[in-house]
C-alpha cells in the first residue's frame, strides 16, 4: 500500500480536531505524490487519477472547514465531511499499491480489494 494508514477522525464533534485530521490527511497524500515524483516512481494514469481526486477532495474540505471553524453551527457538518474524507482516503489507500519490481504505483484489481 502506498498511502499510510491514518487513525480514524475523532468521534466527538470537535471542529479543531476534525480540521487537524483533514490537514494530516492532505499532507500525507501530497507527500506520497511528491515522493513518487522525486524517486522516479511511475504512477499509472488510473492510480494518478484516484490520488489527484482524493487530494482535491481533502484540500477543498480542509480549507473550507478551516475558514469556517469559528461558526459553531457547522460542527456537525465538519464532522460529517471529515468522516466522508476518511472513508474516501481509506478506499483509495486500499485500492492502490506500489510494485517494487517494476517501480510503479497501480490500482489493485477489484476482486482482490478487501
Swiss-Prot record:
Summary of the function given for this chain in its UniProt record: Plays a role in viral alternative pre-mRNA splicing. Activates dephosphorylation by protein phosphatase 2A of host SR proteins and converts their splicing properties. When expressed alone ex vivo, induces p53/TP53-independent apoptosis called cytoplasmic death. May mimic nutrient/growth signals to activate the host mTOR pathway.
Keywords assigned: Apoptosis, Early protein, Host cytoplasm, Host nucleus, Host-virus interaction, mRNA processing, mRNA splicing
Effect of residue 42 to F: Partial loss of phosphorylation ex vivo
A GO cellular-component term linked to this record: host cell cytoplasm
Protein name as it appears in the record: Early 4 ORF4 protein
Top-rank taxon, per record: Viruses
Transmembrane segments: none
Subunit (UniProt): Interacts with host BAZ1A/ACF1, host PPP2R2A/PP2a-B55alpha subunit, and host PPP2R5E/PP2a-B'B56 subunit. May interact with host SRC.
Short motif (Nuclear localization signal): ranges: 66-75
Family note: Belongs to the adenoviridae E4 ORF4 family.
PTM: May be phosphorylated by host SRC kinase.
Cellular localization per UniProt: Host nucleus; Host cytoplasm
GO biological process: mRNA processing; RNA splicing
Paired cysteines (S-S): none
Amino acid at each position: 500500500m502506498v498511502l499510510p494508514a491514518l487513525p480514524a477522525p475523532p468521534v466527538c464533534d470537535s471542529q479543531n480536531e476534525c480540521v487537524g485530521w483533514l490537514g494530516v490527511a492532505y499532507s500525507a497524500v501530497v507527500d506520497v505524490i511528491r515522493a513518487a515524483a522525486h524517486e522516479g516512481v511511475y504512477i499509472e494514469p488510473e492510480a494518478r487519477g484516484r490520488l489527484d481526486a482524493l487530494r482535491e477532495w481533502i484540500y477543498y474540505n480542509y480549507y473550507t472547514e478551516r475558514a469556517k471553524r469559528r461558526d459553531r453551527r457547522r460542527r456537525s457538518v465538519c464532522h460529517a465531511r471529515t468522516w466522508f474524507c476518511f472513508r474516501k482516503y481509506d478506499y483509495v489507500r486500499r485500492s492502490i499499491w506500489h510494485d517494487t519490481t517494476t517501480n510503479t504505483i497501480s490500482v489493485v484489481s477489484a476482486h482482490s480489494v478487501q
